[in-house]
A protein has these predicted regions:
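Alpha-helical transmembrane-bundle signature of multi-pass membrane transport and export proteins
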Residues: 1-436
Length: 437
């Protein structure tokens, strides 16, 4: 039994910290609602346009406000009471979800969905940045890996339940009620945030200004290890993420209907849930940099294999589940490496930078996948993306030995990657951000 407990996810942060329980519970509702929209939005756009490229352009619509607000949202989270920043983001997300529901019910054109997808992205950026900057305050340093694993388990659980629920709701009632689910979920999420203890800004936080985003960029660019961590995630998401072609595969190629579409979106989350539940061993892995590389190779190979064998639905779902498991282990190890790199005064800015990578990468991945499907076909988009991911991460591993050599508990010493290292800060901290839609 002791050996089995060592494999299962560590629930200590949930037991010991009231505020962690509240914020974690708030995120349950937020993630569930967003994951329903993750299916409903591309479904609606594909039904209106019958174009994978149009679906991919959702990613571009979401990326622009993410970039525009991301780093400044981090600076705000470093200077303003973080619960208020979260509530501002949740209010914006509520309006966006309600507008999407109205647009689907009234059969508005595709421009309406691009517009409110952008607004929802801005709201999610505010919410997620402040939340990610708050989590590390709520647990002890020794519980950071367990807290990161629990956050991943939460998101991936929502990534199974949300898409499955979306498929059922869309099949029975259409996409408008599916969008309404997110609006409803925002309400208890906001109430739980209000119950969290006041989260005052750090005393040494930088003043909000136009140079605030530059501080975060310099902090990353001054450390080759951090450059490698963020580049690895971008390679996996931009090249290997096939979500934008799922509507075409499910509705036009495999003929699975809305319920089958929900299964495709849910399968990676199912694999990730199993991986999260069996994540108790991750703290014992010494060579965490190598673990990131191996996990991303498995992710890319599984995605490419799905493109070849996905017409056999059970095999396709298993391959997507394997990819999801690899992704969650990659995220856990990347976040563990980040723990010793971020001071509390910069957590907001660095959480925003991390957020831009882990959510901006998938948006670019949507655009890449949709464009490849438009130029060739959806199957080519999936296979070429997976193989490109494998090649890209192996190339990165060769170019950045710091990533390969990184070991657990070894603090990054700010190995210069450019002249910006002269202005970098060398302090310890954490800024893990679970991947969100």
């Amino acid at each position: 039994m002791a050996g089995l407990r060592g494999l299962l996810v560590d629930l200590t942060p949930l037991r010991r910290s009231r505020d962690f329980r509240l914020l974690w519970g708030s995120q349950v509702f937020t993630s569930l609602g967003r994951q329903v929209t993750v299916v409903a939005l591309p479904f609606q756009v594909y039904v209106v346009t019958h174009s994978s490229l149009a679906v991919g352009l959702i990613g571009l619509a979401q990326l622009l406000p993410l970039l525009a607000t991301g780093l400044y949202a981090g600076a705000i989270a470093d200077r303003v009471e973080r619960r208020l920043v979260q509530l501002a983001g949740k209010s914006t997300a509520f309006l966006a979800a309600a507008a999407l529901a109205a647009g689907a019910g009234l059969h508005f054109g595709v421009w309406w969905f691009y517009l409110w997808a952008a607004c929802g992205s801005a709201g999610a950026t505010l919410d997620q940045t402040a939340r990610a900057a708050t989590f590390p305050r709520l647990v002890s340093r020794g519980q950071y890996p367990a807290a990161a694993a629990m956050n991943q388990m939460l998101f991936q659980g929502a990534a199974v339940i949300g898409p499955s629920l979306a498929g059922l709701v869309i099949a029975s009632a259409g996409s408008a009620p599916a969008f309404a689910v997110e609006a409803v979920c925002v309400i208890p999420s906001a109430l739980l945030v209000l119950l969290v203890s006041r989260q005052s800004p750090a005393h040494d936080a930088a003043r909000i200004g136009w140079r605030a985003p530059v501080d975060g960029v310099r902090f990353v660019l001054g450390r080759r290890l951090l450059v490698g961590i963020f580049a690895a995630d971008l390679i996996a998401m931009i090249l290997g993420l096939p979500l934008a072609v799922f509507p075409a595969l499910a509705l036009s190629v495999f003929r699975l209907g809305p319920t089958g579409l929900g299964l495709l979106y849910a399968a990676p989350g199912a694999g990730a849930v199993v991986a999260s539940l069996l994540s108790g061993w991750v703290s014992r892995i010494e060579r965490q940099g190598t673990a990131v590389i191996v996990a991303i190779v498995i992710w890319g190979a599984a995605i490419a294999a799905f493109g070849v064998l996905g017409d056999v639905l059970p095999i396709g779902l298993l391959l997507l589940a394997l990819a999801g498991a690899a992704d969650v282990f990659s995220a856990i190890f990347r976040n563990s490496i980040l723990q010793l790199s971020i001071p509390d005064a910069m957590r907001g800015r660095m959480s925003a930078f991390n957020l831009i990578v882990v959510t901006g990468g998938p948006r670019l991945g949507d655009l890449e996948a949709g464009l490849a499907a438009y130029l060739v076909n959806p199957v080519f988009s999936v296979v070429s993306g997976g193989l490109g991911c494998v090649a890209g991460i192996l190339l990165l591993a060769g170019l950045l030995p710091e990533l390969r050599r990184q070991r657990a508990g070894v603090q990054d010493q700010a190995t210069p990657s450019s002249s910006t290292a002269k202005t970098s800060v060398a302090l310890g901290g954490i800024g893990p951000t679970p991947r969100d839609p």
